[in-house]
Amino acid sequence: AREKKILLSDMDATIIENETLDDLVKLSGVETNVDETSKLAMEGKIDIKTTLDTRLNYLKGKPKSLIDQALARIKFHPGSEVLVKTLNQKGFITSLVTGGFAPISTFVGDRLGFQNVISNEFKFKDDCFTGEYVPITAGKNSKLNYLNKLTDEKNISKSQVVAIGDGANDL
């Protein structure tokens, strides 16, 4: 039972180099220190939901087209595509589980070949950000809850999971 069977990966600053929500705030033209807010959240010094709410508020009323600009700036970490492709070929279940947002997470997941993409979802009205979202992975234990559900459904031991991430909420 030591053989690994699941890859659970974070997205921002892990499988890609970017912090995509920070990129969106910067692209929107709002003057703020989002990098520091993100850093504190990743260190567990600020609640992840609070920091998401704060950063999304900066996007309220901004055009949805900012997403296309953010997608154009995504930098994949070297080897990320090979990692996912190889593990898929070896029969792993590969899941991108991120506090980031669809459609960015969907783009990254599809591009790299993840079988599952679990993320929050932006809400839009009249092609603009509303500042609200569907909080699928916003909770402190959201990623752990997903892992528990997946391992229970597949009857796989947690010792058979490879999890990679950079933040306090990354298992």
Where are these regions (language model features)?
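Short connector loops/turns at beta-strand edges and beta->alpha or beta->beta junctions
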Residues: G29-V30, G61, F122-K123
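Metal-dependent phosphoesterase signature
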Residues: T51-E81
